[in-house]
Amino acid sequence: MGKERGGKRLNKRMVADMLQALFQAHPGETLTFKQIFKTLKLNTHPAKMLAIDVMEEMAWEDWLSKVSDTSYKLNLKTQVQEGTFIRKANGKNSFQPDDGGKPVFVAERNSMFALSGDRVRVAYMARRQNHIKEAIVTEILERKHDQAVGILQVEKDFAFLNADGNFFVQDILIPKKKLKGGKTGDKAVVKITQWPSEESKNLIGEVVDVLGKQGDNTVEMHAILAQYGLPYKYPARVEEAANKLNTDITAEEIARREDFRDVLTFTIDPKDAKDFDDALSFRKLENSDLYEVGVHIADVTHYIAEGSIIDREAQQRATSVYLVDRTIPMLPERLCNFICSLRPDEEKLCYSVIFNLDDDANVKDWRLAHTVIRSNHRYAYEEVDQILSSNSPNPNPSSGEEGSIGSLPPALRTLDKMAQQLRDRRFKSGAVKFDREELHFDIDDDGKPTRCFFKKSTHATQLIEEFMLLANRTVAEFIGAASKNKNGKSPNGKSAKTFVYRIHDQPDPQKLENLRMVVAPFGYKVKTGGTRNAISKSLNQLMSDAQGTRLQKLIETVALRAMMKAKYSTHNIGHYGLAFDYYTHFTSPIRRFPDMMVHRLLTKYQQGGRSANQDHYEELCEHSSEMEQVAQNAERDSIKYKMVEFMADKVGMEYDAHISGVQSYGIYCEIDENHCEGLIGMHDLDGDYYEFDERNFQLVGRRTHHKYQLGDAIRIKVARANIEKRQLDFILADR
């Protein structure tokens, strides 16, 4: 044993940890004994000899390479990979290889100050005995984020930004002349002008926009958007272009289209919706047992020329973003809320899929057509559910005419029956049933949440969902299946025409096994192998068995993680979750750019056009998939913000809850009354030292053997509500 300069005795483990940290901090460098002893302050002969012995063992393990009798360097494996860096708030950063392999741990000291989403090149360290696999970032290839959002702190000689979220791990220094008028307490957007290096560890930036005072609702929502690089302002030149659009529907244009203005037509949307991009028409065909159901979609691309300034902006945004209290539209307001919105009693241009269906919702014939419609009525989902669940006489006056609103309730009931038939067949074919409840808020005029609740799937939402699914599937089959033979080629030997598909791969087998391990201790079963149909039916049975239990949310969450993410691609592999061989997004061009691409391709091919450039469309698909994920992350952050804001005035109050998650650092608890979730940290679990039993998802007291397990009922007290960090902290109520 040696002695440290402070008199503390050094043991082998301590010296090994010191050496490991030193060599990892200098990857690729040769360090001499003299440098090592000086850096680690190993001044005594016993301490130096202990360090030499440990380095010899590390070399024997291939973790170090011996350069000479008095020098070593870190042994980096020759394997070099590129991929994405993922930063975590708990310090457990990782590297995700491009080849789809498992994430690899990256210690903070080996991260080269990489941020989440950065493209990096790494080298792998030789793996020490009983240690996890680690990677070292050797080069940052591309920065994902060059802007940060946070709170300004202005001092006498300098200023800095305390960044929101987990993208940045350090404050950003700002020269006072680069503040753009920002003051202490302001939320601001800062552009990074200098990244950390070996010479300077500081992040330096300049203010590009002052959002306003911290805590203001609009400021905070804009801050969330800015944090993800999403636009919170609409460019004036794009708005001007939208204002100049000619919206006249001429007689010549109507003559080129199928006319549905006298056919019973209506929209069903959320009660607060403004952009109505889909409508349904319904009529019984004369001298036939069939019904005609039209799925009418706003003809957005009729108004937006490909390559125009409006089109380029929509392409860049790729999707509308739905925060808790606002929508950030993909298109200018004049287009999405007025010109293209299928508002009642207004003539509108549509692109439509018209089905002839029998009583059992079997498609006997269909056609794709550009149309003109005039909606008779605008329904909210709640109104439709009331009609469908009511046996009372029709609440609307009837004039007896085909297009009158008096015909609507009977039409709704027939369409509801058909939708349920379509839904049943879909699940029998192997579709996975994820009816997840979504957390929603009632918001007052100041943007403050007054109530939080779960929205559930209803017959009204399912009615719209099933007919939209039918339209999306049908047009995808029209292109993808019609021209293909068994070899994936068209009859003349050429490849099928380029198209945009919505694809969803089969579940990851390892993640299915993880799901099985999670649910097994609670008596649930799930298949991890077999046919696609067998696995999906097993998943559906699991969801059904967990329905209404305290474990429902957890099981749904873990099951969703086992599923691959759906995305856009020109390379079709089908949609596993829906059990469709061909699927696309056709029905929401107001809010999704892929739907605009689909409309353009269908129009081109209907007119006899040649196949579009696949590489170009694949690039657009990749961008759209990426932007969809970014938008979802921003939406989740807005929910977290409102959840913490809702609980901010309830600190000190007690609630019944249940354990919704177990981690090595504490337990997550969901309040039964309002579904808000917070953390009880390990340090707040008094009376024992608790160890994490990862296999059984529980914490176990070392002395008392008391367990905190998933699903357990628990009484909590709200301890802290940190709105800036979007974190809720609970403690046990009996403390």
Model-derived regions: residue spans:
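Charge-lined substrate channels and their catalytic hotspots, especially those that engage the 3′ end
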Residues: 2-294, 301-346, 378, 385-386, ...
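A short macromolecule-binding patch
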Residues: 102-107, 168-174, 675-692
